Amino acid sequence: MYFKRKIDDFLQEWKADSKHKPLIIKGARQIGKTESILHFAKQNYKNIIYINFALEKKFMQILADGYDVESVTRNITLADPSIQFIPKESIILFDEIQENPDVATTLKSFHRDGNYDVICSGSMLGINYKRIHSNSVGSKIDYEMFSMDFEEFLWAKGYREEQIASILSHMLENKPFNENELSIFKELFLSYSVLGGMPDVVKQYLETGTFSGTLDLQNQIRLDYDEDVRKYAEGLDQTKIISVYRSIPAQLAKENKKFQFNKVAKNARSREYSGCIDWLKDAGIIMECNCLQFPELPLKGNIEESKYKLYYMDTGLLISSLDEEAQEDLRVNKNLGVYKGALYENFVAEAFVKQGFGLYYYKKENASLEEDFFVRTQNTLVPVEVKANSNQSKALSALISNKRYQDISFGIKLGDVNVGYANQIYTFPYFCAFKLKEYLKEKRCF
């Protein structure tokens, strides 16, 4: 069962460009990189050379005689004489290149040679990426891949493009969903949120029609992350990295969701955990939401370095890390319980990052003015409020009406609500979050 992914169109566009460079695909483990690359290769090439450096150690010495195309291809065929290189008809797939990052140095030669298309990928590229980047600067294209978003989940469920496009139409026309539409999309979004976007987890759910077995798969992925820390986190305290990661659910459950090191360990200090958060971000496991000094443009230079929130990159993995009672209530009764606010924020943060948005929030100390997210468009700043209830959006109204904040002309509220508009505030259901960038583009905000 192959799931249609957004990278599919990108790969076709990449190949269609007559001057395309070698491609490096980055992303966390088990998000479907290899499946998508192989699917593309089988559809478009007569000859595929697939090398997995994690599983096939015989290929680790292919650079022994240099980085030129002739030496590399010769050593590959020495390691496996069944491999053939057919100019203009072959694609070379280097997988798990974090195990052999110097392979990136060959991309310059392959680019100049022009006889073979090359795609590199790996689960922990963020960690070794500075080394990989310096080895291939000017000779590659980067693509960051994520776990499945809500739209990809709907594709996997069999929904047609026009059905999915209707969500954006409702937003643009400010037209409320009817009761049936709202109920169905809310149910689908809640199922997606519980599952997350890991393809193996989604596949298990679609094959059985239930959540049975999905939690075991999610728990294994989190255990695999622990192993990655122990294997790849050189020069850092591995136990502290794992402790930071495991503390995030409790951090988000606080009323003040700002990340605090004293919640990781008693009397912990930020300097003791230097590099731990960056490691998790580079691995594609977590997201960082920066606190703005002022809710205004520009965003660069307008960040309070010591204030931030951390979210899981995949909300399904966040849910799988909750206590057993909360998980059971959510999976069986669809009740988010005390974690409601935290989960809704993580849903939205994940949707934003997968659309290419940066994450920013604002909280004024010793004051009630705060906002969950801000989205930057071409010349405006859009505050986005995530409400676990239908209460009035006082902070949004205050930001919009304050003449000091000239960059803000309207706001967006995402909640357990229908489509609506009042007092410069657009209201959308949570499941609309994945369409926000398209919505703003259609409104000519970009």
Please describe what each predicted stretch is.
Residues 130-253:
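Interdomain motor-coupling "hinge/lid" segment immediately C-terminal to the ATP-binding subdomain
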Residues 55-87:
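Short glycine-rich substrate-engagement loop in P-loop NTPases that contacts/grips substrate
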Residues 203-370, 374-378:
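Accessory nucleic acid-recognition modules appended to NTPase machines
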Residues 44-59:
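Conserved catalytic segments around the Walker B and adjacent sensor/switch elements
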Residues 36, 40:
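Hydrophobic positions on the alpha1 helix immediately C-terminal to the Walker A/P-loop
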Residues 1-16:
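N-terminal pre-Walker A segment at the start of P-loop NTPase domains
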Residues 33:
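Conserved lysine of the Walker
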Residues 117-123, 144:
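Structural recognition of the conserved hydrophobic beta-strand(s) that form the central parallel beta-sheet
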